[in-house]
Amino acid sequence: MIYICSPNYFICKEMKEKDDMAWKVLSSQYISQEPWFSVRKEKVQLPNGNTIDSYYVLEYPNWVNVIAITKDGKFIFERQYRHGLRNTSYELCAGVCEKEDSSPLISAQSELMEETGYGKGEWEEFMIISPNPGTHTNLTYCYLATNVEKISEPHLEVTEDIQVKLLTIEEVKDLLENNKV
């Protein structure tokens, strides 16, 4: 298992020692609280005594990413428009860890099935990352799913318009080299 850029609280729990670099929160207030994210404005004091009056923290649920490979060696990508970027891109299957799911693995398997119609196969969690430890509170659980097979048609949410693309390794390399992922 690889842990990359995990937030300080996560590392401290693992080490079971006090974090001498932690910032002191002097005040905290919610600016926005939505089902998918919340924003806090905090006044913080750094260990060196400096104070930051407006530090924004984004609270998100944990996320999952899936590198999925079919039995015949094709990589499953999703092509979709992303309004935040105002661009259509190729992406790995990804989504939110749903509260009703018992684990990130169950969330990852559900996302792959819902968005692509693929499932089964062998699953391995290979990495846990913090997408942006400076401002985000969540972790992303990354999985490799091999030998997956088509089970059903995708079951998309109303906000999703996804084209499922099965790509060879050469096609994936081309997308990466041309910054299309």
Q: What does each model-found stretch correspond to?
A:
Residues 101-106, 115-121:
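Beta-rich strand-turn-strand
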Residues 20, 58-60, 65-110, 148, ...:
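Conserved Nudix-box catalytic region and its N-terminal flanking loop in Nudix hydrolases
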Residues 30-65, 71:
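Acidic, metal-coordinating catalytic segment for phosphate/diphosphate chemistry
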Residues 16, 22-37:
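Short beta-strand/loop segment at the start of cytosolic alpha/beta domains
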Residues 43-48, 132-151, 165:
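Active-site-adjacent beta-strand/loop module that shapes the phosphate/pyrophosphate-binding cleft
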Residues 38-42, 53, 88, 139-141, ...:
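Short beta-strand micro-motifs in enzyme catalytic cores
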Residues 4, 12, 16-23, 88, ...:
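Nudix hydrolase/Nudix homology domain
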